[in-house]
Amino acid sequence: ILDPQGHVEYQFNLVDDGSTTFLTLDPGYAETLIAYLTKMKFMLKVDVRDATSEFAVLRAPGAATDIGGPYALVPRAEVAQMAQTFGAVATQVGTWALDAERVAAGRPRIAFETDHKSIPNELGVLNGAVHMNKGCYRGQETVAKIFNLGNPPRRLVMLHLDGSDVGFPAT
């Protein structure tokens, strides 16, 4: 979700089981996102609430997807059993390993590789997170303008340093 100036305000993944849509996001954003989504309810019957105490997100075994999954949305009462089941077919890793996988795949995380001025055009997420041909959304004017100009003011890139000591050129 963008702010009115086109800056990325919220980043989340959706999980839809056919009757309920869950948004998974980093800690600390739920309260303000719930307030925003509640204000955006117009004609549809939608209940917005924090289900953090009821569900957990686990990285499931398997090849990484374009969002870093597969992920499993698991009722908290079943987390220990699910972790044991996953552990039978995969090696448990910490969050640093998952972050390394995310960075290697070029998936920025809000407030980690971005700042309060970041726009989707700079982050390489236009094709997967922003639709350029339909709808009306906050920040659309900024995103469309930068897209049409073809040159974002900044661009997030991966820089790989091999550790070599190159030294400075002779003067």
Residue ranges and their predicted role:
Residues I1-T171:
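Basic, glycine/lysine-rich polyanion-binding surfaces/domains
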